[in-house]
Design a protein with these regions (language model features):
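Small/polar loops that bind or transfer phosphate-bearing groups
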Residues: 9, 175, 197
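Metal-coordinating catalytic core of metallo-dependent amide/deamination hydrolases
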Residues: 34-55, 60, 68-181
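Metal-associated gating/positioning segment near the N- to mid-region
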Residues: 1-54
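Divalent metal-coordination and catalytic microenvironments
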Residues: 4, 17, 66, 73, ...
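Residues at the C-termini of beta-strands that transition into short coil/loop
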Residues: 30, 107-109, 220
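Active-site-adjacent C-terminal substructures of enzyme catalytic domains
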Residues: 170-171, 180-231
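Residues at alpha-helix caps and immediate loop-helix transition turns in enzyme cores, especially N-
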Residues: 13, 82-86, 156-157, 183, ...
Length: 231
């Protein structure tokens, strides 16, 4: 079982590996239009059939390595049309591929570049338009958000997760990956099924997670790529 993947997306970002080796940080790459934003552009340009074809190859690789169940996140659309395209592609694959693919809506992966300076407008779109449509079509089991400095604040993240809960989506959270920012504490507060990354989680946050029964999903390969100590 792989409980945390971003398997359905367009394009690739191998050029950023060189930037990482030269010392650029995750957030520096993202703020320069790379990272999540680069993959968002390529995913918006891809058709649903192209996403299915690219994701099929990735799922084939998972299966060859003994993985039979995969959680898959959207979050490389950051608009209604492309988020739905990612989730619909995963739905098709879950029906046709040997792997069991469990979908997560992650419109809260980042604020798209066209909403820079208007973050609350994007959150309104996510809460009022994206989440209801995803729930209406039954395209996701979970609702995830990237609670991180420069992405979504704990308060914004809570709004997104609580909106999903009202629609029947189970909360998950990318927490304290780059900085200690209260993500672990928020996971406990909202009753998330899991908090993921946790490289910089506070001792208090971990204690609260344990008390609330939140699963810690640790991602050692991410720590290696970020050149950080493992959680």
């Amino acid at each position: 079982v792989d409980p945390h993947t971003h398997v359905a997306y367009g394009g690739s970002r191998e050029k950023e590996f060189e930037m990482r080796l030269e010392g650029s940080t995750y957030m520096e790459i993202m703020n320069a239009g790379g990272g999540i934003h680069a993959t968002t552009r390529m995913t918006r340009e891809a058709t649903e059939d192209e996403l299915v074809a690219q994701t099929t190859r990735r799922l084939d690789s998972f299966l060859a390595h003994g993985v039979t169940t995969v959680e898959g996140k959207s979050g490389y659309g950051l608009d209604l049309e492309t988020e739905l395209k990612q989730l619909r592609a995963m739905k098709r694959l879950n029906e046709t591929h040997p792997i069991d693919l469990v979908p997560t809506f992650m419109g809260g992966h980042a604020v798209p570049q066209e909403y820079k300076g208007s973050e609350e407008q994007y959150i309104d779109l996510l809460v009022n338009d994206m989440l209801p449509k995803v729930a209406e079509e039954g395209l996701a089991v979970f609702n995830d958000v990237f609670c991180e400095v420069g992405v979504f604040t704990p308060e914004q993240s809570e709004r997104i997760l609580e909106a999903g809960k009202k629609l029947g989506l189970i909360p998950k959270i990318h927490a304290d990956e780059i900085e200690s920012y209260g993500g672990a504490e928020l996971a406990a507060k909202v009753g998330a099924i899991s908090a993921e990354h946790l490289l910089k989680a506070s001792d208090e946050g971990v204690r609260l997670m344990a008390e609330a029964g939140v699963i810690a999903c640790l991602l050692p390969a991410t720590a290696l790529y970020l050149r950080e100590e493992a959680a």
